């Protein structure tokens, strides 16, 4: 069964009429930059696939959270930010920090090699998680 996706303009109009400002939700991903460089030299497509796997897994695992449900209801307004981690150690340290702070996330492990490649958070309001991500820059 397919769910009808309502145009974002209709939803925004309804919110404007009710005086409710829509909450902006962002899904953050942190992808290992070193995988694109020697000695790994993974192709761009392989890195994009890792980010896609992590994002999909995080959305699925946290599908019952109200933020995830709201994010998925507004397909035309989805926001993702892809940041870069220098290496595996940096990525795993971030995963540990997120775990300690109870920030819902998925650490994607490429199989069968068991290589940590990407972290995806479930959708969050930016202000709730920016303090944990501010040291990471946009992936280039």
Swiss-Prot record:
UniProt entry keywords in alphabetical sequence: Hydrolase
Keyword Cell membrane (UniProt): no
InterPro entries referenced in this protein's UniProt entry, alphabetically: Pep_tRNA_hydro_II_dom_sf, PTH2, PTRHD1
Keyword Acyltransferase attached: no
GO molecular function, a single term: peptidyl-tRNA hydrolase activity
EC number: 3.1.1.29
Bilayer-crossing regions: none
Pfam families assigned to the protein according to its UniProt record, in alphabetical order: PTH2 (PF01981)
Enzyme class, UniProt record, top EC level: hydrolase
Catalytic reactions of this protein: an N-acyl-L-alpha-aminoacyl-tRNA + H2O = an N-acyl-L-amino acid + a tRNA + H(+)
SUPFAM superfamilies given in the database record: Peptidyl-tRNA hydrolase II (SSF102462)
Homology family: Belongs to the PTH2 family. PTRHD1 subfamily.
Function: As a putative peptidyl-tRNA hydrolase, it might be involved in releasing tRNAs from the ribosome during protein synthesis. Some evidence, however, suggests that it lacks peptidyl-tRNA hydrolase activity.
Protein name per its UniProtKB record: Putative peptidyl-tRNA hydrolase PTRHD1
Natural source organism: Mus musculus (Mouse)
Lineage of source species: Eukaryota, Metazoa, Chordata, Craniata, Vertebrata
């Amino acid at each position: 069964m397919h769910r009808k996706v309502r145009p974002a303009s209709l939803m925004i109009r309804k919110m404007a009429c009710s005086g409710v400002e829509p909450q902006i939700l962002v899904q953050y991903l942190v992808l290992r930059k070193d995988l694109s460089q020697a000695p790994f030299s993974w192709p761009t497509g392989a890195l994009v696939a890792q980010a896609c796997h992590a994002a999909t897994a995080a959305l699925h695992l946290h599908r019952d959270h109200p933020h995830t449900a709201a994010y998925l209801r507004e397909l035309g307004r989805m926001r993702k930010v892809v940041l870069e981690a220098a290496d595996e150690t940096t990525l795993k340290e971030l995963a540990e920090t997120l775990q300690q702070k109870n920030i819902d996330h998925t650490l994607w492990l490429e199989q069968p090699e068991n290589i940590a490649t990407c972290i995806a958070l479930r959708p969050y309001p930016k202000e709730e998680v920016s303090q944990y991500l501010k040291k990471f820059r946009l992936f280039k």
